[in-house]
């Protein structure tokens, strides 16, 4: 009789429902209620690689007394260094510009081809580098929409990732840039 539990995953996405309450009087004057829902999953697509996504939406049910640090802030980036949390961050979004105390919805998706394309090119196959494509979107009361696409090469020397990102934001503003990331935990 086995004495261990083996979790083999699920074919269904993971859903998290959250609620956050700031109670005034406990050494603070903040008073707000935030309800959130998040869904994420990794979908194995055989030879075509893996598709991963994370979507989150939230609404401040009460925002009676809030300070800027209590707002919902989105993981942005204004440097050439990529955030390791690829499925919860934007590549080109300015810091704090679109932070909100009302409602929001964001979604991130990436497809890792796991060599599906590059393995057909002899020198690239030998280098074991892999291709990745991603998309990111943000909606909230501060703007109509913000979109990003990124195209990258990962597993360079097993730990380095290069991305080229394109962003399209409010008022028809385009942005683009290169990013470098390291997939190693120190």
Regions found by a protein language model. Give the residues of each.
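Exposed, low-structure sequence patches enriched in small/polar residues
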Residues: 1-186
């Amino acid at each position: 009789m086995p004495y261990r539990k083996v979790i083999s995953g699920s074919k269904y996405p993971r859903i998290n429902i959250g609620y956050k309450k700031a109670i005034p009087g406990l050494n603070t004057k903040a008073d707000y209620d935030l309800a959130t829902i998040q869904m994420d999953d990794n979908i194995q697509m055989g030879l075509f690689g893996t598709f991963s996504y994370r979507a989150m939406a939230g609404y401040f049910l009460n925002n009676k007394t809030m300070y800027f640090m209590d707002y919902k802030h989105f993981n942005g980036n204004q440097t050439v260094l990529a955030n390791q949390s690829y499925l919860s961050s934007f590549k080109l979004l300015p810091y704090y510009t679109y932070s909100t105390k009302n409602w929001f919805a964001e979604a991130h998706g990436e497809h890792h081809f796991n060599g599906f394309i590059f393995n057909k090119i002899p020198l690239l196959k030998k280098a074991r580098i892999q291709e990745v494509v991603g998309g990111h979107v943000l909606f909230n009361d501060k703007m109509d929409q913000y979109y990003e696409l990124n195209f990258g090469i990962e597993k360079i020397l097993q730990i380095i990732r290069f991305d080229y990102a394109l962003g399209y934001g409010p008022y028809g503003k385009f942005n683009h840039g290169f990013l470098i990331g390291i997939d190693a935990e120190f």
